Amino acid sequence: MFKHVSKLTSEQIISLEAPLMYKGIQNITFTEIDIEKQGIIEETMLKMLKSRYAFYDKDNKKHPSILLIKDDRIKTNQIDLMNELYNNKKIQKNWALIVYNGDGIFVKLPQHKNIEIQKNESINSTLQKIKDLYQESIKYIAIISGDLANRGLSFVSTDYSWHLTHMIMCASNSSTGTNLMQYSRLCGCYNDDIPLEMFTSVDITHELFAYDNLQERCVEKCEDPLLD
């Protein structure tokens, strides 16, 4: 039920402050890629290997690069992408690959590593199991997802110590700012200083920052005493 307010004043608006540990769009490094280019995901993952990231959590324990690939909505294509990536020997050797969609969880670990994952396992418990078994040896994790990688889902381990560090956003350039912001699962509350990086197109980057600025202006306007 909605209550109609004939005259809204600034005193009736409660502004909620973001937690100090919150990382938003302004805290993310954006790297331009051609999201239409064939093989751009594989190319980006190989470049990440060359960067030799070394991350540590708040307890100074190793934290892997965890990449979310927000790509095709068609579930069979997500499995095809995982298999295609796994056929690359460098990726097969270094990356743990996860598909997370409405059909469940599908996992391929680097060579000579095994894990027992139930099909209906949550992404959080899956990350936790990998952490418990292979924290010292698995340095790269890629999660391929579609519609499930939207607002309301946090890609973190159950103990909250592992979280996303990178994202490839291959959304349509015609996507609205609202949708793109909901796709941006890198945003969140993290109790460490691990840098966050988004790989996407120039158009999507501009749209995200434009929408973020619009939100800021709306908040400032609502807090303006002249509203009265």
Describe each model-derived feature in a short phrase.
Residues 148, 182-186, 202-203:
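Catalytic cores of nucleophile-dependent amide-cleaving enzymes
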Residues 2-8, 81-87, 158-165, 182-187, ...:
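Short secondary-structure boundary/capping segments
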Residues 206-228:
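Long, hydrophobic alpha-helical segments
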